[in-house]
């Protein structure tokens, strides 16, 4: 089981779809060697050093957290059913209302659209909020996503810089 890493007063909570088998096997988020999450958040400015999956709890040292829509592990995220995403979206709203991070970063357009019953999502900051929490849609860092690492870093850096401008 991959546990959430959450606390109050975080700058950002990154929300994945569900754990892959590598994460489920280790208990750490974004554990597959091809997943670029840890590299990207470091290069984008969220962490002072590149953490390893087994150091995930140290995200809190940088006022970052992680969660997911669905707890059930799968080989690929496309194995998650729409109803699981919708149910996960309701639970995610409750978590965000409780912890109130400055921003929630949903990793993937389809995840945002399915989890929150939205259509036509664009990358970046959304008009939808959860209380005072901004919602951002960022590309998923999975190794299965063909987007170049540089483009991932650019998208994530936009969020980091926006939070800095907001004094966070």
Curated annotation (Swiss-Prot):
Enzyme's top EC category: hydrolase
Record flagged with keyword Hydrolase: yes
Superkingdom of this entry's organism?
Bacteria
Subcellular location per the Swiss-Prot or TrEMBL entry: Cytoplasm
- GO MF annotation, one: pyrimidine-specific mismatch base pair DNA N-glycosylase activity
Q: Does the keyword Transcription regulation apply?
A: no
| Keyword terms of this UniProt record | Cytoplasm, DNA damage, DNA excision, DNA repair, DNA-binding, Hydrolase
**What does this protein do, in the record's words?**
Excises ethenocytosine and uracil, which can arise by alkylation or deamination of cytosine, respectively, from the corresponding mispairs with guanine in ds-DNA. It is capable of hydrolyzing the carbon-nitrogen bond between the sugar-phosphate backbone of the DNA and the mispaired base. The complementary strand guanine functions in substrate recognition. Required for DNA damage lesion repair in stationary-phase cells.
PANTHER family referenced in this protein's UniProt entry, alphabetically: G/T AND G/U MISMATCH-SPECIFIC DNA GLYCOSYLASE, G_T MISMATCH-SPECIFIC THYMINE DNA GLYCOSYLASE
Q: Subunit details for this protein? A: Binds DNA as a monomer.
Q: Which family does it belong to?
A: Belongs to the uracil-DNA glycosylase (UDG) superfamily. TDG/mug family.
Q: What is this protein called?
A: G/U mismatch-specific DNA glycosylase
Q: Which organism is it from?
A: Citrobacter koseri (strain ATCC BAA-895 / CDC 4225-83 / SGSC4696)
Q: Which gene encodes it?
A: mug
């Amino acid at each position: 089981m991959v546990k959430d890493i959450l606390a109050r007063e975080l700058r950002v909570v990154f929300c994945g779809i569900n754990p892959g088998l590598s994460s489920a096997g280790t208990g750490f988020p974004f554990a597959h060697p091809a997943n670029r999450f840890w590299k990207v958040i470091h290069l984008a400015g969220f962490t002072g050093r590149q953490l390893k999956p087994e150091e995930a709890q140290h995200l809190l040292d940088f006022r970052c957290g992680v969660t997911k829509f669905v707890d059930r592990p799968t080989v690929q995220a496309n194995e998650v059913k729409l109803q699981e995403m919708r149910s996960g979206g309701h639970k995610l709203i409750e978590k965000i209302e409780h912890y109130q991070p400055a921003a929630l970063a949903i990793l993937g357009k389809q995840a945002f659209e399915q989890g929150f019953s939205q259509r036509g999502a664009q990358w970046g900051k959304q008009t939808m909020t959860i209380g005072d929490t901004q919602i951002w849609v960022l590309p998923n860092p999975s190794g299965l996503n063909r987007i170049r690492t540089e483009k991932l870093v650019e998208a994530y850096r936009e969020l980091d810089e926006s939070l800095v401008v907001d004094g966070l």
